[in-house]
Amino acid sequence: MSENNNDKTTGKKTLTLKRSVLETSTVKQNFSHGRTKAVVVETKRRKITRPDEKAEPLQPITKPHVAPQRSKPRFEEKKPQEAMAKSNLSSAEMEARLRALEEAHIQEKITREQAEKEARLAKEREEILKQEIQEQEILQKQEEEKPTVPISSVSSDPSLIEKTDIPIVPKNTTVIEKRKIDENQEEERHSRRANPAKSEIRAPKIVKGADERRRGKLTLNSALDEEGSARGRSMAAMRRRQEKFKRAQNQEPREKISREVVLPETITIQELAQRMTERSVDVIKFLMKQGQMMKPGDVIDADVAELIAVEFGHTVKRVLESDVEEGIFNITDNPQNMQPRPPVVTIMGHVDHGKTSLLDAIRKANVVSGEAGGITQHIGAYQVEQNGQKITFIDTPGHAAFTAMRARGARVTDIAVLVVAADDSVMPQTIESINHAKAAGVPIIVAINKIDKPAANAQKVRTELLQHEVFVETMGGETLDVEVSAKTGQNLDKLLEAILLQAEMLDLKADPQRTAEGVVIEAKLDRGRGSVATVLVQKGTLHPSDIIVAGNEWGRVRALIDDHGRHVKEAVPSTPIEILGMQGTPQAGDRFAVVTHEAKAREISEYRQRLARDKAVARQTGSRGSLEQMMTKLQTTGVKEFSLIIKGDVQGSIEAIASALEKLGNDEVRARVVHSGAGGITESDISLAEASNSAVIGFNVRANKQARDFAKTQGIEIRYYNIIYDLVDDIKAAMSGLLSPEQRETFLGNAEILEVFNITKIGKVAGCRVTEGKIERGAGVRLIRDNIVIHEGKLKTLKRFKDEVNEVQSGQECGIAFENYEDMRAGDIIETFRIEHINRTL
């Protein structure tokens, strides 16, 4: 007896009373993901008994003295062991061993039942598979017994018959594939089974003359069968059927469609092919035939593109890049919607004649105190109301540097108010303002200001205006004139009445129901709000969320702010308004218009930016030329450039500064604005100044902390200004420092060489007598022989007798030696002179 509790089913068991008559076999199960399991199946052979015999009853396991006859020798061997165990083991140990034997028998019984169950399930699966195969064979036979249409074309035209035997594929491919899921499993199962009973699945027989049309294959034997059986469709018929199906599916080459191709001035090959709906490869092949090797990304001009499009059978419509701007400003007004609009009045005149003060008195505000130096350096737009009627005022600077601003103000105005100081009369900027107003074709109203001063002489002003073809009413003309005082407010109401009277005569009307259109008065870059443009709406009504194009920039209107800082919902004609939401800062004087969608606005903006860039490049190329030309020009002319980076608060001021600096240069030095823009000074401006060796100028703006630190590190000075006079004066002084000083030569005297001495360690020394003026030590000298200057240099030694002296007067003798020159002869004349350097100014 063994104490090992081994519950595995094997051929030999140690804890049995008799050898079990079992037949073993192994069943291998396959699961998903490649897992397998082997199960041992034991089949007990039944004992055959006769009817008159009784089965031998099973003896209880716990009685060792009862033993089966077949195991008698084995039992007899165990007898002394059990007797010995009885004598040596206690009752508790004996019970434990008997209990272990019982558990082993129970485990063996469970294992045997599981194996029988697995074998039964495997047999059932095999029977189900056989049944399915039989059903498939029956269905296949029924299908093949159906009548088929005979094929006459095959017998009539044997040349169309395929001459190679084509194997026939059975229809029960799904069943065969099901059988072949795991071929190794079936082979192993049948090889290990004790009573192998393989059920070979034979391919179903194909009935002669069956419908082979479904297979699409035909053999020579079946086509030439003489028994008159039904024949399938020929291969030629199958091909014709496939070609017909392809034609039905439009798989043949499509018919060429002629299109109208829009061609700009330049276009890439890829884009041209897309517009023609052709392949770019075909276009490139056509160009290769013409002898041009090009790529899809290459740019061709409109002429070549037109030839290609015509060759491919398309019509061409040529357009210009400027066509994107068509229809923006050419919108016609509806006469039925025309309504009266407020007049736009521009205040013009000489500097310090009281233009802004007059406007302040009308607006009852104080703008002058906010302007640096008491002078207007920005163009401002305001709106006032008089007797229920609105008047839009545009204030322009009077300084000479703001000529462009005055011209811009005159172009957008309806009436020009010419302010002339009664104590100062007509001045240069007054004349310029008159010319601007006449060029713009707007009527003029003369406002004679400062009439309250004792030195005021209004009649003198009227008389001087006659010289410039401005005829006031008191002098028999048609121009209105009003004597006013901005300080006391005298006759301001008369001035406003004159403006309204002139506007009534002009009959100003506009259509508020159309899209907005106008002009940019001023533009700046605000730190918190971004690009801010002050515009004057001339036509239509401007609303928030409108998409506008102003010059080279575009944007969507985020907010509309009036001259009092209030947000408004719309801006009607003749209204000055601030716009927020521009993508960039437009230039003052640019026209703006509302467009329908964002794509068009972006296209117009990109076209204008490209045009401005090309003009700038052409201007630089024309002024610079090639490198050799530039170097030759620098060597011959010696022009020096004073590079500047200008940052200002608004575009108009930057424009005025650049215009003033252009007038400062001469043939030797000139100012060059490397970069200019509205907004504060940033670190990138300092980097650009370092790279271009430029000076940084801030006009009414400041540098941020990063820019200041970087400028301090790089040693770049930043100059701040708020008055344009001071800026221009400082730049003028700095540019004057670049001018080469003027050299002025002063004649000192002449000396005649009497004899030349050769002295050791010194060289040749000329013994001379001063014949005119004096000879000074360190002066410049010229050696003249036969009235020809043969040497010019400096005086090295001047001695009288044996002593070094600073100067020798006329009539005295002295010894003279030259620096690095010794070719002196008796009779030569030595001329001495002094050169003075005098600084020049612009």
Curated annotation (Swiss-Prot):
Positions of the UniProt region annotated as G4: 449-452
Region G2: start-end pairs: 374-378
Chief site of localization: cytoplasm
Region ranges (G1): 349-356
Record's keyword terms, sorted: Cytoplasm, GTP-binding, Initiation factor, Nucleotide-binding, Protein biosynthesis
A Pfam family this chain is assigned to: EF-G_D2
Stretches for region G3: 395-398
Region described as G5: 485-487
Record's compositionally biased regions (Basic and acidic residues): 176-190, 199-214
Residue numbers spanned by region Disordered: 42-91, 139-253
Subcellular location: Cytoplasm
MF GO annotations: GTP binding; GTPase activity; guanosine tetraphosphate binding; translation initiation factor activity
GO CC annotations, alphabetized: cytosol
Protein known as: Translation initiation factor IF-2
Species of the source: Bartonella tribocorum (strain CIP 105476 / IBS 506)
